[in-house]
């Protein structure tokens, strides 16, 4: 299956034919299209300081880059910036006649292979993908992680080991939490052996467990846990609440629901807390976004939660953590709200 995440895709074209192809693609997919001042048309942005400079800026700000032109041009421009398959953006190259779509960089973890297939399907072109798992018609651990927006404590090592096992035709099992069945059904799991029951494993060389849980039973084979980011935390706190206290209480709340900390997807609060140092540091430490909502937006859902007159007077709404978690999870809340030392934390699940 192709799972494309077109959050921010930059496209670069250098010829009239490239501009024409870019216009075809832009009509079907959200793109930011760049070209030279000479070729610029409505909907295109001119290069800032030249093609190479613009492309290199985009490499650090977009999740995917598409180049219409020669592969060598893309390679020479981006070579100084290429760093790591887990952090570099997806890079795809298309010839200006739209006959070949080439996955150049970050095929699995960055999603370039999925984007390549998607673009090729749109254009009726030939997708050119060279990663070993794909040419052997198998998925890959980093592809699965990308499709599930999942994390792992040592993904780099696991990807190297598991992908090698897959292409060597070893038996790698795949088990998942029951509540993730629908999502797994939308992922590419070719090459993995589905496992229904951890207590009754088939003959396996290794096992991948896709789970939000903070622990797993003892297993008789080498195994890794892949944790989808699905948990959100609405947090209210007093001004200048220290980061260590916030981190301790969040960890306790996750533990109370038997959730792996890696499952955290976002932290939310009221707009007044946008500059709160402890919350900013907490989100940074957890490597998740810190999202804030206006008091007006939170008030729409505060009737679902106990309120505080003091909090209402201070921030304009009687409850912060509950409504914030509600907005982040569309009302899919988990457990009871933690209230301690001026901090409130409400958890939810967002898909």
From Swiss-Prot:
GO biological process: cobalamin biosynthetic process
Main enzyme class: hydrolase
EC numbers: 3.7.1.12
Keyword Hydrolase: yes
Keywords tagged on the record: Cobalamin biosynthesis, Hydrolase
UniProt GO molecular function: cobalt-precorrin-5A acetaldehyde-lyase activity
InterPro entries reported for this sequence: CbiG_hydrolase, CbiG_mid, CbiG_N, CobE/GbiG_C, CobE/GbiG_C_sf, GbiG_N_sf
Superkingdom of origin organism: Bacteria
Catalytic activity: Co-precorrin-5A + H2O = Co-precorrin-5B + acetaldehyde + H(+)
Pfam families: CbiG_C, CbiG_mid, CbiG_N
Record bears the keyword Hydrolase: yes
Matching NCBIfam families: PRK05788.1-1
Family: Belongs to the CbiG family.
Name of the protein in question: Cobalt-precorrin-5A hydrolase
């Amino acid at each position: 299956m192709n799972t494309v995440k077109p959050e921010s895709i930059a496209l670069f074209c250098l010829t009239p034919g490239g501009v024409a192809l870019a216009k075809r693609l832009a009509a079907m997919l959200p793109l930011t299209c760049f070209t030279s001042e000479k070729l610029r048309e409505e909907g295109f942005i001119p290069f800032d300081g030249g093609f190479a400079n613009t492309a290199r800026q985009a490499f650090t700000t977009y999740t995917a880059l598409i180049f219409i032109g020669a592969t060598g041009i893309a390679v020479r421009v981006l070579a100084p910036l290429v760093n790591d398959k887990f952090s570099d953006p997806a890079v795809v190259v298309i010839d200006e006649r739209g006959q070949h779509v080439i996955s150049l960089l970050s095929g699995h973890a960055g999603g370039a292979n999925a984007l390549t297939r998607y673009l090729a399907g749109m254009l009726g072109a030939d997708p050119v993908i060279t990663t070993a798992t794909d040419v052997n018609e198998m998925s890959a651990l980093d592809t699965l992680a990308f499709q599930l927006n999942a994390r792992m404590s040592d993904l780099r090592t696991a990807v190297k080991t598991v992908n090698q096992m897959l292409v060597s035709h070893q038996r790698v099992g795949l088990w998942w939490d029951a509540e993730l069945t629908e999502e797994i059904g939308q992922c590419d799991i070719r090459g993995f052996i589905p496992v229904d029951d951890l207590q009754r494993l088939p003959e396996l060389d290794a096992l991948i467990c896709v789970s939000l849980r903070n622990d797993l039973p003892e297993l008789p084979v080498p195994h890794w846990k892949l944790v989808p980011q699905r948990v959100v935390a609405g947090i209210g706190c007093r001004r200048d609440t220290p980061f260590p206290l916030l981190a301790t209480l969040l960890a306790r709340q996750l533990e109370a629901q038997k959730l792996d900390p890696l499952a955290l997807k976002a932290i939310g609060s009221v707009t007044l807390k946008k500059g709160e140092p402890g919350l900013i540091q907490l989100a940074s430490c957890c490597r998740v976004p810190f999202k804030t909502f206006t008091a007006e937006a939170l008030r729409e859902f505060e009737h679902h939660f106990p309120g505080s007159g003091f909090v209402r007077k201070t921030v304009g709404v009687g409850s912060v953590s509950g409504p914030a978690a509600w907005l982040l999870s569309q009302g899919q809340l988990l457990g009871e709200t933690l209230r301690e030392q001026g901090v409130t934390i409400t958890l939810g699940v967002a898909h």
